A protein has these predicted regions:
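Alpha-helical scaffolding segments of alpha/beta enzyme cores, especially the outer helices
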Residues: 85-88, 92-96, 127-134
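Glycine-rich phosphate-binding loop signature in dinucleotide/nucleotide-binding domains
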Residues: 54-58, 100-101, 185
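Active-site segments of SGNH/GDSL-like serine hydrolases
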Residues: 65-71, 95-127
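Conserved beta-strand segments of alpha/beta enzyme cores
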Residues: 31-33, 104, 140-142
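Short, structured coil segments at secondary-structure junctions
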Residues: 26-28, 101, 139
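Basic/polar N-terminal segments that are highly enriched at the extreme N-terminus
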Residues: 1-3, 198-199
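Catalytic His-Asp segment of secreted/periplasmic serine-dependent ester chemistry enzymes
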Residues: 110-199
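Conserved SGNH/GDSL esterase-like catalytic core that processes O-acyl groups on lipids
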Residues: 2-92, 165
Length: 199
């Protein structure tokens, strides 16, 4: 059986978090690739889509997340990226990924910060997630709700030292959910193809 090609894009929640374990959960039938750099803002991730276009071309699934950098309000005068611009950039990213021949597209919602992390308020995170999910669903993007998953036990899933990144336990839990969604989505997409269109 031909290996399924999977690409992971995203910020540090991916890079030093769930992304470290997805390949293990998916197993030997999947070829998982991800950049070794942080995707940071949604706009930087869009740039990565260009830089890594050869890796992305023909991928059976591209799983992506961005938002922590965008919604951050360090100075008290508003987030780095306005919500409307954030959503527009995600939509542009989806459009480019489709042009590059990527198959199933999966967006992971932005994870919540710990209590007292004012520059990453849970309310603003939820607001950005709602806007992104509403827009991306219309484009056929599958949603991996990491916000909902991590919100079930922030104390266990968000590191107390920085109130932002995933604990070791959360890395595994998020990776398992991510791998399950990727595998199920690729299987479902394959079932929709006619015999003559199979890769």
């Amino acid at each position: 059986m031909q290996m399924k090609k999977v690409v992971l894009l995203g910020d540090s929640i991916r890079l030093i978090g769930y992304g470290k374990h997805v390949a293990e959960f998916l197993g030997r039938d999947y070829d998982v690739w991800q950049p070794s750099e942080n995707s940071r803002f949604a706009s930087f991730m869009l740039r990565q889509v260009f830089d890594h276009r050869d890796r992305i071309a023909g991928a059976d699934a591209v799983h992506f997340n961005a938002g922590l950098w965008d919604l951050c309000d360090l100075f008290g005068d508003g987030p780095f990226t306005p919500k409307e611009e954030y959503v527009a950039t995600l939509l542009r990213t989806v459009s480019v990924l489709k042009q590059q021949g990527a198959g199933t597209l999966i967006f992971a919602t932005t994870t919540p910060a710990g209590p007292g992390k004012k520059d990453h308020s849970i309310e603003r995170t939820a607001e950005y997630n709602r806007a992104a999910v509403e827009a991306l669903k219309r484009e056929g993007v599958i949603i991996n709700d990491l916000f909902g998953l991590v919100s079930t036990d922030i104390g266990a899933y968000i590191r107390p030292d920085d109130m932002l990144h995933l604990t070791a336990t959360a890395e595994i839990v998020c990776a398992k959910q991510t791998a399950d969604i990727i595998a199920a989505s690729i299987t479902a997409a394959a079932g929709k193809r006619t015999p003559g269109s199979l890769k």
